[in-house]
Regions:
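Metal-dependent nuclease catalytic cores that hydrolyze phosphodiester bonds in DNA/RNA
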Residues: 1-132
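Mg2+/Mn2+-dependent nuclease catalytic core
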Residues: 99-185
Length: 185
């Protein structure tokens, strides 16, 4: 089956691929999204923050050291010792956002719209008491204050984090996994 991506073609019967970031583009500016996906006029973008991808890589490497064996010390320290980094043969594919539409990667088709939604997971934890999975999304922040406030998910711009988590939980459930509605950032 040929992949249907980049530009929407109403005559193409294959599911149209939309990444998590493209969903956010639609939420921010539906007209810009339409121009991008139908007319090929690119949505304005920001340069990537290399610190974010480096943080993700370092945290994943740290979790890989105990994956499928035991909890990570930072989880234990924060009262989450019952959560263990999840080991699965497809995890490397699921964490590859650049190939999400390819066979076996992290996506699911929404049948009513024939849209293939996907992205790249940061990580997954398994609850050793319930067997449920918890989606993890690593976020980098800079708080230079002398008295930093705890990071939270309040604020309009953080709604995209919630949508991302909801989408990834939905996809994992569609892949047949028992997934807890609680995810971790």
């Amino acid at each position: 089956m040929a992949r249907h991506r980049k530009f929407f073609d109403p005559n193409n019967e294959n599911p149209f691929e939309i990444s998590r970031s493209k969903v956010e583009n639609f939420v921010r500016c539906p007209a810009c999204f339409w121009l991008d996906k139908v007319k090929g006029i690119k949505f304005p973008s920001m340069p990537p923050f290399n610190i974010n991808s480096n943080t993700d890589k370092l945290l994943k490497r740290d979790f890989d050291a105990v994956r499928g064996i035991k909890t990570h010390p930072i989880l234990e320290k924060n009262g989450l010792g019952h959560l263990i980094p999840f080991k699965h043969d497809d995890l490397d594919k699921w964490t590859s956002s650049l190939h999400f539409g390819a066979k076996g990667y992290f996506h699911s088709v929404h049948e009513e719209t024939n849209i293939l939604l996907g992205g790249g997971l940061d990580d997954v934890l398994i609850n050793e008491h319930t067997g449920e999975l918890h989606i993890v999304d690593f976020k980098s922040t800079s708080n230079q204050s002398k008295e930093p406030k705890p990071v939270n998910l309040y604020g309009d711009w953080k709604m995209s984090y919630k949508r991302q988590m909801d989408m990834y939980i939905w996809i994992m459930r569609r892949l047949g996994f028992e997934v807890n509605r609680v995810g971790y950032f």
